[in-house]
């Protein structure tokens, strides 16, 4: 199903909101809606709805299915910081493209992420970040294998893999 020979073939795409995303040759689609934009999509479709429903929690565990460029994770941190929330967050994120994660410290992220550049750098180098408020772990490999090994209770799930048409393995009911 997956074609590893195409994994490194990606093209940078400028979205209508001015943010950048990538187009995956392997999955024949962009990582984000080029019309909505990467940041807008992450905030409006994933982060804000999830955090509004969890606003009274002081600790959250989030499963960000398919880390990719990290927009959902980084938008979560950005939102928590800009809203002045004291929520402690642990994010677990499966990702099979280690090369992509390791390249994130050179990706052209929006200025909204300037305050978390040190986090992006740590994740790209160590696949991990932790401070008193945020803990982020990248689970390298197939999400179908890493997710069953998660021991803690997950409060929020960002299901943001490539579309069911192009990545049906992550949209089945058996996983």
Predicted segments, located by residue:
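Class I SAM-dependent methyltransferase Rossmann-like catalytic core
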Residues: 2-58, 69-85
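The AdoMet/dcAdoMet-binding core of the Class I SAM-like
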Residues: 52-152, 158, 170-173
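Cell-envelope and extracellular/periplasmic
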Residues: 160-162
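Short glycine-rich, flexible loops that bind phosphorylated cofactors or substrates
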Residues: 165-166
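Well-ordered alpha-helical segments embedded in enzymatic catalytic cores
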Residues: 42-46, 142, 175
């Amino acid at each position: 199903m997956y074609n590893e020979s195409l994994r490194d073939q990606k093209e940078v795409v400028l979205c209508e909101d001015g943010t950048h995303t990538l187009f995956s040759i392997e999955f024949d689609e962009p990582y984000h809606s080029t019309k909505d934009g990467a940041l807008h999509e992450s905030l409006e479709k994933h982060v804000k709805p999830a955090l509004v429903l969890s606003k009274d929690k002081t600790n959250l565990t989030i499963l960000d299915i398919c880390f990719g460029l990290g927009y959902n994770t980084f938008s979560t941190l950005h939102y928590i910081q800009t809203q002045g929330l004291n929520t402690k967050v642990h994010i677990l994120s499966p990702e099979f493209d280690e090369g992509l994660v390791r390249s994130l410290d050179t990706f052209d992220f929006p200025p909204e992420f300037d305050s978390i550049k040190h986090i992006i750098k740590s994740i790209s180098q160590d696949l991990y970040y932790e401070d008193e408020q945020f803990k982020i772990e990248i689970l390298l490999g197939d999400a179908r294998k890493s997710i069953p090994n998660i021991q803690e209770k997950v409060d929020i799930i960002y299901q943001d893999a490539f579309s069911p048409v192009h990545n049906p393995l992550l949209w089945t009911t058996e996983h």
